[in-house]
Amino acid sequence: MALTVAGGVFLSIVEAPAQALNLNRLGTYSTGLFNQTAAEISAYDALSQRLFVTNGATNSLDILNISNPQAPTLFNSISLNPYGGAVNSVSVKNGLVAVAVAATPKTNNGTVAFFDNNGTPLNSVTVGALPDMLIFTPDGTKVLVANEGEPEPISTNPVTNPEGSISMG
């Protein structure tokens, strides 16, 4: 049976005995919001020792300083309102941060906004409808985006149902 490198890594983790895995809590960070989508997707940047967290409650990207993992602190919070609707995902590679933002309505084409690891805006590009997941290529030169293309609710007349797509750039 042939396995890919990623598959081999996955299998070696799955096959490891439970006793070999030991997770300990190092620290916590609270947004101060309860029962809201205040922290959904996160991405770590080793260069800056920062954690980038999508905050759906405030439609922002929260940047946490985790150089001391026992005491994470809020470094910056970036409003994503200028880029469209709801924040959906974040990815980081070599100090470059990409954030997927849906349009309003979600059936329109969304945006990927780029920032440096301090939160300074660099650029933004239009992608397909409802960009939901994004990841940098291993060499960090491109971003792959999964655009869900979900329809509006049935109560909308006429119903708009955009195609799902993949964007790369």
Residue ranges, per PLM feature:
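C-terminal segment of classical bacterial N-terminal signal peptides
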Residues: 6-17
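Mobile, glycine-rich extracellular loop/lid and propeptide segments
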Residues: 19-169
